[in-house]
C-alpha cells in the first residue's frame, strides 16, 4: 500500500516521502497515529498544498527537543532516593517513572516513555547513566545518582 508520510518514521522515511508499506501496518498504526495518509491523487494534491506547514511543524518539534536536550545537559545529574540495604542493593527498584519524576521536579518536561533504561530498572545505589530519547534524532544522557535513605 502506498502512503505519504506526514511525520518522520524510524526506518521508513521523513515528511513527504511516498513509501510502500504492508496494508496492516498502514491501517493499524501509521494512519490512526496521524503519521501517514493513503497516497491517492486527492491526498497527494492536498499534501503538496500543506507541505511547507508540515515541514515547519516538524522543524519546530525538532528544535523543541534540542532545547530540552540542552536543559538536560545543563542539569547534568538528578538524585533519586530509595531504601537500600548495607550492601548497596535497593529494596525495590528505580523505574523510568521515578527518573522522569525527578527530571520534572528539576524543571524539565519529560515523560516516562522518553526515559530509556538499557538493562531494566536500577537496583543498586550509585551513579547510573540513563538515556532520554526526546525525538527520533535527539537523545540526551543524564546521570542518575541513587542514594540510600
UniProtKB/Swiss-Prot annotation:
It comes from the Bacteria. One of its GO terms (molecular function) is rRNA binding. It comes from Haemophilus ducreyi (strain 35000HP / ATCC 700724). Gene3D superfamilies: Ribosomal protein L9, C-terminal domain, Ribosomal protein L9, N-terminal domain. One of its GO terms (cellular component) is ribosome. Belongs to the bacterial ribosomal protein bL9 family. This is Large ribosomal subunit protein bL9. HAMAP family: Ribosomal_bL9. Binds to the 23S rRNA. Coiled coil: none annotated. One of its GO terms (biological process) is translation. Keywords: Ribonucleoprotein, Ribosomal protein, RNA-binding, rRNA-binding. The gene is rplI.
